[in-house]
């Protein structure tokens, strides 16, 4: 029996554009970063039994992204041992932060290494779990398109590091619900053929971009609009935007001191919001 401790970082979509839809999936373009908010997973290989335990008891222990990973990877391994995963949930659930995908990717990385499964196989299997899982396998700044499987890593992109994350308490928002109700008057035009080369051009793109799912998310959680309005009023806020399918929002800052001012004020004045600092990895 072997035990491993792994971390799964939360994801932020700096922008999210929807380009179209086929019979099953939406096609998208998104710039993703990962931040220092982690779920902590204890993975026991060759355990007495297989299973998953979450500190957040609202998550289905028997049908979730981790159980799917264990099943899929066991089909590509000669190992037939039990795997048990205990998860300390720090990433908000159903909040646009890809907590389930991050957990799945963390387990995939570990089991792929222990069971000697090729990275290309892991990337193919990741998409079977969810559209954010391929990006979460990398957990680095990247540009994703398609369903999320077409990934361009951006190791040299230097972004503002400090993020204030705000979510309305008790307002989880299902990704499936938002996408199923997304009915745009027109889809966004692709930018993938003309991606920026210079640092300043990337920053300009980020500032002028958007989250195409915002209007749909507002139908279910109108409070998102107030959160964004409040964040944008703070000094030196570069952008304020919703991440993923919501309802979590973020504000981006160059200086930690500016972000700390926002967190202190909102934690004192808005007990109905979850507010905390984060840093881009």
UniProtKB/Swiss-Prot annotation:
It is an enzyme of class 2 (transferase). Gene3D superfamilies: 3.30.230.10, GHMP kinase, C-terminal domain (3.30.70.890). Disulfide bonds: none annotated. The active site is at 11, 132. ATP binds at residues 92-102. It holds the Pfam family GHMP_kinases_N. Transmembrane segments: none annotated. This is 4-diphosphocytidyl-2-C-methyl-D-erythritol kinase. SUPFAM superfamilies: GHMP Kinase, C-terminal domain, Ribosomal protein S5 domain 2-like. It comes from Ehrlichia ruminantium (strain Welgevonden).
């Amino acid at each position: 029996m072997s035990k491993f401790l792994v971390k799964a970082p939360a994801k932020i979509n700096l922008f999210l554009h929807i380009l179209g839809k086929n019979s099953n999936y939406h096609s998208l373009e998104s710039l993703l970063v990962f931040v220092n908010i982690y779920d902590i997973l204890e993975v026991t290989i060759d355990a007495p039994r297989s299973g998953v335990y979450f500190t957040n008891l609202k998550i289905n222990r028997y049908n979730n992204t981790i159980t799917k990973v264990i099943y899929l990877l066991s089909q590509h391994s000669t190992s037939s041992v039990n795997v048990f995963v205990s998860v300390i949930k720090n990433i908000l659930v159903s909040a646009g932060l890809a907590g389930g995908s991050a957990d799945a990717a963390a387990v995939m990385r570990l089991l792929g290494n222990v069971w000697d499964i090729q990275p290309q196989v892991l990337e193919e299997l990741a998409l079977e779990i969810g559209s954010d899982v391929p990006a979460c396998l990398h957990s680095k700044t990247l540009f994703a398109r398609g369903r999320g499987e077409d990934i361009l890593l951006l190791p040299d992109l230097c972004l503002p590091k400090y993020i204030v994350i705000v979510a309305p308490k008790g307002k989880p928002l299902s990704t499936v619900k938002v996408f199923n109700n997304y009915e745009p008057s027109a889809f966004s035009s692709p930018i993938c053929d003309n991606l920026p080369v210079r640092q300043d051009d990337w920053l300009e793109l980020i500032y002028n971009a958007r989250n195409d799912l915002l209007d749909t998310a507002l139908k279910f959680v109108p409070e998102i609009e107030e959160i964004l309005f409040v964040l944008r009023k703070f000094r030196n806020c570069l952008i304020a935007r919703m991440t993923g399918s919501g309802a979590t929002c973020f504000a981006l800052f160059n200086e930690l001191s500016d972000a700390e001012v926002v967190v202190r004020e909102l934690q004192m004045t808005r007990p109905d919001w979850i507010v905390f600092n984060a840093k881009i990895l």
